[in-house]
């Protein structure tokens, strides 16, 4: 993978609609909620939550499987609390991972999460520099 990533967005209307293009990928629609937009796509802040959840979940999954753990399902929910005035940045983000596995124990999960948060997930590392991220997990036996 190249060290340089790129994305281009083009407006789709006279309001806040955009179509995002990343080379080799399907386009993605972005928009804002009324009154500024038409609510026809993800908002940029929603995509930040999606990126964080995906990056963290992927990192945890890779690390657990490297430890020869059986992981049948990973669900990550992300919820961000925004500032009330502009810029309406995230003040805090809560991540919750639900790992379905017959052989992952809480101590391993805590260790894997620390590694994912500090080494494996670049989205987490970038966001944690400016946002408090609180992480929890649930282990489900499969």
Which residues fall in each region the model found?
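Extended beta-strand/beta-hairpin segments
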Residues: 1-50, 61-142
